[in-house]
Amino acid sequence: MQTPVSVNEKKDFIRWFLNHYQLKRRECVWILNYLMSHDSLMEKVHFVEQAEFCPRGIIMSTHCVEEVPFRFYKENVMTTDAEKSFHDIRLNKQQDLFIQLNFRSAYSSPEYAAVLESNPHIPKNLFENKKDQGLAEQILEHAISTFQREKLLKDIDDALDRHDKEAFEQLSRQLNQLT
């Protein structure tokens, strides 16, 4: 569905997220900051929907939504103890970690769309209506494309402001490849 999300893109998103939203549990902030401080862990982080279906999934919610504050799933066992999940993350650094973030306007956020990956662990029969699933994927692809284009245009403007010809040319090539 999309190209892999880079470690830097994930870190940029987490920084943006923490600057714009307040999580219901402070331990969630600790976990996200811990993940950001270790590139090897960030390579294993995947932002997804419906993390409860994943072998190792975390659900975190902000104050602006009604969803549960925190849940950690590991092989069909669920806990609300953030310290246990933090311990598991530290001990199992080589395992993929799937994170679902519940926050206001998540589905209209281009920042979130840019790092959101399809969840390979969702049961096939969960999506009864394939037409809706296809439409949702098209909307997500469009949001990602729009976000990438806007980010490149901003970076090009910044390069022009700095009179950085090399960065301008490289970013322009990237923009041309998008279109």
Swiss-Prot record:
Gene3D superfamilies xrefs: Uncharacterised family UPF0302, N-terminal domain, Virus Scaffolding Protein, Chain A
Superkingdom of this protein's organism: Bacteria
Database matches in InterPro entries: IDEAL_dom, UPF0302, UPF0302_N, UPF0302_N_sf, Virus_scaffolding_prot_C
Membrane-spanning ranges: none
SMART domains reported in the protein's UniProt record: IDEAL
Record-annotated disulphide pairs: none
A UniProt-annotated Pfam family: IDEAL
Coiled-coil blocks: none
Family under the similarity heading: Belongs to the UPF0302 family.
HAMAP family named among the record's database cross-references: UPF0302 (MF_00760)
The protein's name: UPF0302 protein YpiB
Gene that this sequence comes from: ypiB
